[in-house]
Amino acid sequence: MKIRKPKKEKVFYLIGAASQTGQVREKDLLVMKPNFWAISGNGYAQFSQNYISDNWYKGGESTVSLLSGAVLQFNYDDKQKVQLENKIEWKLGFISAPSDTVHQYKTSEDLLRLSSKFGYKAITNWYYTISAEFKTQFFSNYETNSDKMVSSWLSPSELNIGIGMDYKYVKDAICNLSVLINPFNYTRYSVASDKVDPTKFNIDAGKKSKDQLGSRVEATLKWIIINNLTWESRFSYTTN
């Protein structure tokens, strides 16, 4: 009697996959590779107009303002040890300035902030962390009724790099708390434009930058109160 070698089957159901005749059926198995990256973001835009009559005894002036902002996040979490958080944030606001005869509009909000934080889990809720943050502004800002520049793109700019620990508390995707403690923090202030006075930004006269070593504490809270209503706050304190 000739014995036939069995064919190599791809995948078999071991439990509950047999037919009524007792034969095992062949089945392909689709394995999904986990995606540890999460991309999210939100934005807003607000427009307001304020009219004050000439007869109003307290005085004042009518204004038109526009405020906008956005936050983009690119985060990595392997659900075991490693976390990487990257964030891009900007705020832009403009307001009309009737009393300013030189400039028709002025900036009321102007911020660009880039941040990154790498964490390796130490114990429950605590991570060894290396963090970096850079912030500056987009547009030039001037004194009222003057062409004297107060601030501009990269003037000033601030860079923070720190090493420390990060405490994280997350509850049911409703509350997200992070407290970053950097005992070792490096800060660099710089002014790129020759038209901006560096002494207004903690930089010595005649210089373009200033380096400082110190510590830094930063706490961020995101709390979803109800659907479509979220509370976000941020606290930062740096020593030198």
Q: Which functions belong to the PLM regions below?
A:
Residues 1-35:
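N-terminal periplasmic/intermembrane-space "pro-region" immediately following the signal or transit peptide
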Residues 62-68, 106-112, 155-161, 209-215:
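Residues that define the transmembrane beta-barrel architecture of outer-membrane proteins
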Residues 39-45, 84-88, 128-132, 159-161, ...:
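Transmembrane beta-strands of outer-membrane beta-barrel proteins
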Residues 54-60, 96-104, 146-152, 200-207, ...:
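Extracellular loop and loop/strand-boundary signature of outer-membrane beta-barrel proteins
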Residues 31-52, 80-84:
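Transmembrane beta-strand segments of Gram-negative outer membrane beta-barrel proteins
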Residues 41, 45, 68-76, 114-120, ...:
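Residues on the lipid-exposed face of transmembrane beta-strands in outer-membrane beta-barrel proteins
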Residues 45-51, 90-96, 134-140, 169, ...:
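Transmembrane beta-strands of outer-membrane beta-barrel pores
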Residues 34, 75-79, 119-125, 170-174, ...:
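Outer-membrane beta-barrel channels and translocator barrels
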